[in-house]
């Protein structure tokens, strides 16, 4: 060895351990790496669809599959809910498989990464335990010498804190299928809740999916700016608000079908309309009868006058004949 100093015996083990992404003692960050630059214009990060609520504490894997050797760099970009202003990145050279930058796996609970070259396609994966501190968005990013391209974004939620008012009783319902912008879970029947007590006039309930690790979410909630849009959009369309809309539609339907029993004012208005119509009909009938009676009386008087005139004429003719006979 030429009298040189031998490397420590633990260095190969450390290097092997680092290759699997369990330590952040990797190569220094490549500041000029396109995958570390903000994704702008038409290549900006895509809005994540269908945030998923998965079993709390279970290990899961986020995998990005890329065309082989089409892009020199591949990356997984991480935005955690608790630290949305901090971006963690795992950047790998797609040609050599060497890590260029990694501040993601060591800051994520149980984080491990792996890069696989399958010939036609390459696969970069990041596995970790899903807990409150690891919830967030995981974006697959491609990079070359000029720009970067976000291909897919996965949003993961570990638990949901629901503050309920005392005058409302709502059951938060999650769907079993992916719906854009709304939180969903593959198995809604496994949904459980933790009663965290009262905060003023509101009741805090934490919803989660039990995992095999036995870990439970905490009732203490810090500021989670990144996860708030996912959760609030889901709660805005939850079972409670749907029930209110259905009840309102049902009330309007019964109002149209049976307004007599539903609203006394509408019944009184209808009765008044019927009474007014009947009165108008009676007045019209009285007027028509009066007019007919008046016409009948006039006709009778005219007939009597005609008959009297004829009788007078006959009498006058008879008198004139008698006078002629006497002469």
UniProtKB/Swiss-Prot annotation:
- Where does the record place it? Host membrane
Protein topology in the membrane: Single-pass membrane protein
Q: Report keywords, A-Z.
A: Host membrane, Membrane, Transmembrane, Transmembrane helix
Pfam families tied to this protein: UL141
Which superkingdom heads the taxonomic lineage of this protein's source? Answer: Viruses
What GO cellular-component annotations does this UniProt entry give? host cell membrane; membrane
Q: Where are the transmembrane segments?
A: 266-285
Name the Gene3D superfamilies on file: 2.60.40.3790
Q: Which residue windows does the record flag with biased composition (Low complexity)?
A: 305-319
Question: Where do the segments described as Disordered lie?
Answer: 297-327
The text of the family note is: Belongs to the HHV-5 UL14 protein family.
Name the chain's protein.
Uncharacterized protein UL14
In its UniProt entry, the species of origin is given as Human cytomegalovirus (strain Merlin) (HHV-5)
Q: Which gene encodes it?
A: UL14
